[in-house]
């Protein structure tokens, strides 16, 4: 499932004729983003945030140490 789809060329969904690109009906409407409601006071959210912050701090420290 993590494999990239190599069968479809990258420009397959783009209009090939430059005149078609300007037409309003030729461009597909972007899929609306799904709004996700996250409970910021939940213990699971706090635990995940602390884990992400810790990893980011370690990354920044390693980045700083390697550039010195």
From Swiss-Prot:
Residues 1-42 are annotated as: Disordered. InterPro entries: Calmodulin_Regulator_PCP4-like. Signal peptide: none annotated. Residues 1-16 have a biased composition (Polar residues). The modification Phosphothreonine is found at residue 8. It comes from the Eukaryota. This is Purkinje cell protein 4-like protein 1.
